Swiss-Prot record:
It is a single-pass membrane protein. This is Uncharacterized membrane protein YnzI. It is found in: Cell membrane. GO terms for cellular component: plasma membrane. The keyword Cell membrane applies. Residues 1-29 are annotated as: Disordered.
Amino acid sequence: MDRKKDEIQRKYREQMREKKEREKEDGSSHTFEIVVVLAIIILMFFFNSVFKAF
């Protein structure tokens, strides 16, 4: 009985660990996308102001 209970707990912990790792990967990819989009927008404004000066 105890062995079965330990196995169930171990499987549950593994599932929770995998879920956390997946969420962490998703979160980091979203922050990277946001940084790229912001950089593109800032560069567009920068080049727009530079070309207006000429």
